[in-house]
Each structure stands twice: as structure tokens, then as C-alpha cells.
């Protein structure tokens, strides 16, 4: 068994310097960072607004944000596939099997996480400082900025949780990205598709091997 495991490991380390490996890692980070940024831009203010604002349907939105923490990736991927396919309502945009579709898919998965965690992070500061902010006549936007600054550590944790969701995603990006070599192939899809039924070390063969004499 030792001999069987040695070869894939050697191949993996040798592949670290190949152009395809660098391209896969670069695309993975680009897609995940972009999706996380989009999710943060939407999720942070939404999570804060759910804490300080009172409006009809607020409790339902909080419930949905928490429920979508466990949103099945395959459901998101399938829904986006149907929307972006040629016969779908957004087929004219030609987004299917592109990095842009992967960003959208990952952002949809990360947004509920950042929203729900931000809402929880700001609840306590709002109870403590909300009265003072109202007395000072702070607007809702100003209050949101202040609360996000006060709970910045928890907010950073929420964003990191969103990034962890995006960088580890497989099913959704596989459906909408297609795992096209040199175009939409990222780290997770490359490893999973090359893994041979759970054999230890087989996932290393997902990476390109350097040319041999």
C-alpha cells in the first residue's frame, strides 16, 4: 500500500509548479473572493437592517435567512442551470458554463450565511447602544455603520464563514460551470472528478502532471 500512495503524492508536489495548477488555484480564489465580496455587500447591510428595522414580514425574512443556511447546493445549481440554459428566461445572457455563473451560484449560497450571522452579531450591540443612537438622532444607515464597526470581529467571522462556503463548494459550480479545463475548472471540482471511488491519494491525480522524459 505504501508504494501505491507514494506515486500520487510525488505527482502532486511535482504538479505544484505547472501552469495549469496555478491557473486552477487562481480561478478558484478569484471566483470565491468575488462571490464572497458580492455576498458581503448584500448580506452585511441586510443582516443589520433585520436587526434595527421593524417592518411587516421581518420575522419571516429572519426565518428564511436562517433556513437558507442549510440550502442544498444542488437545488441552487439546478435552478440556475434552468434559468441560464438556452431555453431558460436568462438564456440570452449566455452565462451558463462561465466563471460569472459560478460567482452568482457561490454568492447565492454565501449571502444567507453572512446575513444570518450578521443579524445575530448585531443584536446585542443594538440592545446596548440602540437607545443612545436614537437619542442622538442617528439615521438607520448611520446606525448600521456604527453597529457594524462595534461588532467588527463577529462581522469578519461572518464574512470568513461565507468565504469558507464558497471556496469549498463543489456541486453548484460543477452544474453551472461545467468543470471545463482551462476555463471553469477549480480546485474542488478538479479533485472530486479525478478521485477514484475514495482511494487514498487518488485525488492528487486531479492536478496536471509535469511533462516527463
Question: Where do the PLM segments sit?
Answer:
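Interhelical loop and adjacent transmembrane-helix boundary motif
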Residues: 15-20, 175-212
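Short cytoplasmic-facing helical segments at TM-TM junctions of multi-pass membrane proteins
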Residues: 117-155, 188, 203
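Membrane-water interface segments at the C-terminal ends of transmembrane alpha-helices
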Residues: 2-5, 14-123, 150-170, 205-213
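Short juxtamembrane loops and helix-capping segments at transmembrane helix boundaries
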Residues: 11, 92-96, 185-190
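Juxtamembrane helix-boundary/capping and inter-helix hinge elements in multi-pass membrane proteins
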Residues: 19, 53-58, 123-128, 138-140, ...
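Hydrophobic side chains within alpha-helical segments
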Residues: 109, 131, 172-174
